[in-house]
Amino acid sequence: MRVVVVGTSGSGKTTMAKALSQALGVPHVELDGINWQPGWRDLGTHDPDEFFRRVAEAAKGEAWVMDGNYTKVREAHWTRATAFVWMDTGRWLVMRRVIWRSFSRAVSKRELWPGTGNRELFRKWVEKEHPIRWAWDTWEMNRARFMAAFGDGTFEGRPAYRVGNRAQARRLIARLATEALSI
């Protein structure tokens, strides 16, 4: 099973992808972990071909769960996906989550992706690209985009699941884990 998890920043993509990959016993690939290089270098902007190559390499596996919304590398992994999960979380819950996540990361000063040295900094909160502002600014656009892509429960003939809360997430994880056992 190869599953792509999408949703706006703070919707629970990575949390869902980690839990699903653990339940399925397959690797979890976080596209942010591929994109964000040491010193917050944005690989997708600075070397889009290399970003695409790395995502395509990760997508070669027989089974995985990937999370992220990078449209510039969609062809590298969406074409191999057997299912899609759209984390359709309400705007106010997204904002609460992303503010709490940013705060806890800034206080803990933990490295976000191993080997990058990248850490959340309070002084970055005012920048346009910061996840708090990004989540607010892109929530509506992302929701419309994912509704158009997955609104009928499929994407190019493959299942697309819409998850709006934790209970739905738990049920979907259990369902997909059961389905994976029968394959």
Model-inferred region functions:
Residues 5:
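Hydrophobic anchor at the beta1->P-loop junction of P-loop NTPases
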Residues 9:
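The conserved Walker
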Residues 13:
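Conserved lysine of the Walker
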Residues 16:
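Hydrophobic positions on the alpha1 helix immediately C-terminal to the Walker A/P-loop
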Residues 19:
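Active-site signature of alpha/beta-hydrolase-fold catalytic machinery across serine-
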Residues 23, 133-183:
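NTP-dependent small-molecule kinase module
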Residues 27-84, 89:
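Conserved nucleotide-sensing/catalytic segment adjacent to the nucleotide-binding pocket
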Residues 89-142:
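A glycine- and Lys/Arg-enriched "phosphate-lid" helix/loop adjacent to the NTP-binding pocket
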